């Protein structure tokens, strides 16, 4: 009814401009679905339609449909169900400024608002469907993204254990965990390099393409790089605001 009002003018719909980098397509699809609803969205029904369209499940075997749906319901009820008062997501050692606990009393165990075993269960289910759904680009992206999160959670725990070993004077464990942290960082980087959505080059070039003059292109390039690094000029009070994990 809003679109057909006499005073609608040039309105043709509603969109989103996020402080983000095109991640979590499920959340934004759900948000836009909710815009035109008078009642709360039936998430289970929406999820079924979403997965059918995103992964092309029309001709998929029943066990594949049920398996991938079960994985996503696990994600919806854990990763996508934050009922805490936390402001923003938890930062990971992978993306925030390098930090090492100043002492044993300042050590903080990594944690999240969702149980890690739920994330791993969802990931395992997706892996079981990988052979059948490998032809879906949407599935391949989601599998990389969920795998990334699983590995990042592991990385943070290894980083914590390296600090714990340091302050326990356990040099052998400190060296082992530190080596594992650095190795896993490279593995996560290799994983993300399989998708253009996680590469710096396409991100910067897409921003530059919006410019019509050399000056505009340079400005947009600066903004694109700033958004994923300092988020402002050097000395900005925003600490790690660009962290996008």
Stretches found by the model and what they are:
Residues 1-245:
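Substrate-binding groove of N-acetylhexosamine-processing glycoside hydrolases
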């Amino acid at each position: 009814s809003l679109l057909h009002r006499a005073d609608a003018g040039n309105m043709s719909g509603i969109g989103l401009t996020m402080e983000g980098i095109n991640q979590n397509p499920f959340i934004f699809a759900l948000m836009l679905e909710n815009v035109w609803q008078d009642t709360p969205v039936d998430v289970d029904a929406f999820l079924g339609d979403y997965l059918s369209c995103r992964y092309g499940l029309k001709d998929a075997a029943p066990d594949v449909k049920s398996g991938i749906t079960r994985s996503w319901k696990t994600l919806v009820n854990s990763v996508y169900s934050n009922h805490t008062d936390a402001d923003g997501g938890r930062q990971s050692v992978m993306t925030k400024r390098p930090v090492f606990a100043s002492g044993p009393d300042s050590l903080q165990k990594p944690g999240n608002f969702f149980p890690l075993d739920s994330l791993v269960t969802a990931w395992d289910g997706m892996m079981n469907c990988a052979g059948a759904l490998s032809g879906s680009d949407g599935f391949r992206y989601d599998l990389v993204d969920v795998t990334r999160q699983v590995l990042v959670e592991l990385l943070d725990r290894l980083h914590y254990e390296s600090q714990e070993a340091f302050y326990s004077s356990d040099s052998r464990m400190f060296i082992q965990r530190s080596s594992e942290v650095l190795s896993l960082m490279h593995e996560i980087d290799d994983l993300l390099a399989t998708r253009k959505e996680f590469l710096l080059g396409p991100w910067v070039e897409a921003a530059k393409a919006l410019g019509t003059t050399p000056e505009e292109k340079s400005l947009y390039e600066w903004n694109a790089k700033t958004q994923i690094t300092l988020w402002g000029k050097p000395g900005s009070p925003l600490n790690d605001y660009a962290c996008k994990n």
